[in-house]
């Protein structure tokens, strides 16, 4: 009891929530919303904490409805797919390099293969260009479909923008209603606090009312945060729409200006390269003719000189005869030396054999050791 009185003495005077035009503007409301504010405030019933817990739930349901509806229409990968396809268009365009049409040709001795090589290379490149052009047109068609989806998405984002604005307004209504009801409950709690006495029922009623006031104050704070989040969503939606529109415009530029201009430039480059190749072909033909004449003259000189040298040459060269004679003399000398060495080796072998034979006979004619011992004992 004393504690309750002390708390009452410490509290500041209660100020009723005044819905002035300035206050309403801060909450995103107008004077026409005041009746709705009072109607929403009456939903909070004294002695029913559940009404505080459910306060503002209809706003969440409103948000969930339009968010789910948009999510059913939106695929997060749409923008990624559009960007990926545009990247593929650029990659395909860059893959067509007109450089191969003007590569340096090898100098061939015959004119026919040179012309054939030029024709095959040009034909192959044109076939490659046709294939790449078909791929680019297919990718452009796919991106155009995605672009139409993005344009429709912007219309859905307009609906989302309107829904978020309505959410912001509804949150403002609930915040104002909550503050109105909060001031009333606080005033009611202060009145009860002064007459609580020693009645346990009144004490509990006051405690429940204080708890309800605290919960409602917390709920109002949450709604204020949600309203600010909704307000932040509005410029976010507009930025997304602006990005979508820039992507749509960029694709229009690529499809209607860039790709046709690229095709025209490619055809111009192809024509210029054909002219360049024609000049290079004529130059290559002239170079081949001059090179052929030079090589024929050099070949004539080489064969004539070699023929004259062969006609003045002896059947057998003197150097060959000298080498043959030197080899023959060396062969005779080597044979004689080998024969002499063989005679000497045989003589040495006979001497060694005779010595071994004498040694063997001497060993065989010697008396045994036992007989020598008997002779010594006698």
Curated annotation (Swiss-Prot):
Keywords: Plasmid, Tellurium resistance. Pfam families: TelA. This is Protein KlaB. Belongs to the kla operon, which is associated with cryptic tellurite resistance, and IncW plasmid fertility inhibition. It comes from Escherichia coli. It comes from the Bacteria. PANTHER family: TELA-LIKE PROTEIN SAOUHSC_01408 (PTHR38432:SF1). One of its GO terms (biological process) is response to tellurium ion.
């Amino acid at each position: 009891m004393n504690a309750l009185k002390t708390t009452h003495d410490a509290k500041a005077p209660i100020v009723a929530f005044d819905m002035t035009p300035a206050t309403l503007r801060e909450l995103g409301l107008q004077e026409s919303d005041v009746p709705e504010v009072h109607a929403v405030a009456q939903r909070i019933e004294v002695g029913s904490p559940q009404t505080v817990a459910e306060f503002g739930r209809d706003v969440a349901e409103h948000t969930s409805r339009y968010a789910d509806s948009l999510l059913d229409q939106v695929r997060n990968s749409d923008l990624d797919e559009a960007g990926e396809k545009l990247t593929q268009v650029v990659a395909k365009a860059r893959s067509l390099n007109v450089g191969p049409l003007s590569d340096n040709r090898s100098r061939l001795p015959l004119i026919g293969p040179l012309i054939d090589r030029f024709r095959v290379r040009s034909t192959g490149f044109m076939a490659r260009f046709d294939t790449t052009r078909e791929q680019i047109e297919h990718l452009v068609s796919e991106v155009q479909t995605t672009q139409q989806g993005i344009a429709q998405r912007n219309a859905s984002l307009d609906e989302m923008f309107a829904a978020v604005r309505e959410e912001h307004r509804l949150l403002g209504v609930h915040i104002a209603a909550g503050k109105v009801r909060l001031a009333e409950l606080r005033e009611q709690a202060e009145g009860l606090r002064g007459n609580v006495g020693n009645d346990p029922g009144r004490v509990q009623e006051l405690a429940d009312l204080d708890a309800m006031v605290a919960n409602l104050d917390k709920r109002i704070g949450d709604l204020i945060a949600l309203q600010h989040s909704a307000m932040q969503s509005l410029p976010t939606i507009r930025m997304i729409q602006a990005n979508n529109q820039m992507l749509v415009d960029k694709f229009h530029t690529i499809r209607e200006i860039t790709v046709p201009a690229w095709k025209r430039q490619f055809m111009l480059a192809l024509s210029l390269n054909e002219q360049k190749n024609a000049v290079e072909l004529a130059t290559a033909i002239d170079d081949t003719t001059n090179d052929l004449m030079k090589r024929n003259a050099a070949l004539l000189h080489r064969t004539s000189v070699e023929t004259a040298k062969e006609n003045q040459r002896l059947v057998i060269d003197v150097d060959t005869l000298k080498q043959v004679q030197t080899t023959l003399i060396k062969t005779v000398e080597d044979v004689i030396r080998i024969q002499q060495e063989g005679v000497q080796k045989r003589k040495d072998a006979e001497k060694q054999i005779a010595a071994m034979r004498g040694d063997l006979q001497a060993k065989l004619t010697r008396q045994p050791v036992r007989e020598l011992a008997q002779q010594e004992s006698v």
